[in-house]
Amino acid sequence: MKLKRIAALLTAAVMSVGVMASCGGSKSDDKSKADTKSAAETSGAEGDSSESEEIPVSQTHTNDPMTVTSAKDLVAKMSNGWNLGNTMDATGEGLESEISWLPTKVYTNKFMIDMLPEAGFNVLRIPVSWGNHLIDNNYTIDPAWMDRVQEIVNYGIDDGMYVILNTHHEEWYMPKPSEKDGDIEELKAIWSQIADRFKGYDEHLIFEGLNEPRLRGEGAEWTGTSEAREIINEYEKAFVETVRASGGNNGDRCLMITGYAASSGYNNLSAIELPEDSDKLIISVHAYLPYSFALDTKGTDKYDPEDTAIPTLFESLNELFISRDIPVIVGEFGSMNKDNIDDRVKCLDDYLGNAAKYDIPCVWWDNYARIGNGENFGLLNRQEYDWYFPKLMDVFKKYAESDPSAAAA
């Protein structure tokens, strides 16, 4: 691993030589710039693979053969997942927004993504915020932003991973009657462009229509109302119809559907109404449990194995969906670093163990944050190409190796 890390750093340095020369950078800046630049930063002027140098990213994967499969069968091939958090979902403008929320300004590159399968992950979720990258009143997505998103999608696809692409911090949707029609118009406009760009990809690419849709800033923001839940069901219907009408492989693509706030609460889960479709829909839920241990910055740093939050979640998911042959993916989970690695290991083992009973893949939220008093979910050291917490990685590998169907994918 050490040799591979050194090779990755050297190759990254070689890739950025042309960029630095054109910008007049000094030799003393070489190492830091090599560590923080990716080829895509130059909007295709430099590529980080021979393929991207020869073929524009927009012309890749235009006609991949599609293996038509049910969502249940597809999810059965998944093991552990990893979120590229606080990256493409940052809410700034321009290509620089990719690094605006990161503690060290490291652009995503192929070497990072190559580390995931080796560590026991075969699912890559790429949260993307699109609203600040629209260039006109017709909701046209900035072509440079679309290209950069596609480049990162290709990193995972070319590694044989299952890639989940979503709309993330979209401040423009608010599930209220007064906002509904405008929200659906924008939702359809954005997803029609995403679906068209990626319609040639095979079943390894999954679309997730919404991320934690909720009444932002209101008293019921995280609990929801019956009215808001119904409107979100309408949003999801519009998402599915838009993708299905876009042609290519999208008629058979598996899609992820979320309820209010992607909540794991029973009331919100039970209010999900799946749009009329084939057997290619997957439920998406987010669950940082037990809350006081996993997500509350002022909560406990001790994990109580007698806490029932985790088993109760998976029992509810089984009752509402799995038992009805509707697959589920936990699209976000994790426990933040409170200098309590042994307790985090126990929690992760319990979480993945309960999920495995029902063949539910879980996707860790990695926001590249590790120290301080905030939400520190970082696992991958994106600058040094190693893992911050090897004991946690051992747990992921344990469950990846115990899932022969996922390993065979």
Curated annotation (Swiss-Prot):
UniProt keywords, alphabetically: Carbohydrate metabolism, Cellulose degradation, Glycosidase, Hydrolase, Polysaccharide degradation, Signal
Biased composition (Basic and acidic residues): 27-38
Gene3D superfamilies xref list: Glycosidases
EC numbers for this chain: 3.2.1.4
Superkingdom as given in the UniProt entry: Bacteria
An example Gene Ontology molecular-function term: cellulase activity
Keyword Signal: yes
Signal peptide: 1-21
PROSITE patterns on file: GLYCOSYL_HYDROL_F5 (PS00659), PROKAR_LIPOPROTEIN (PS51257)
Active site annotation, chain numbering: 212, 332
Compositionally biased region (Polar residues): 57-66
Family assignment from sequence similarity: Belongs to the glycosyl hydrolase 5 (cellulase A) family.
Protein name per UniProt: Endoglucanase B
Native organism taxonomy: Bacteria, Bacillati, Bacillota, Clostridia, Eubacteriales
Name of the encoding gene: celB
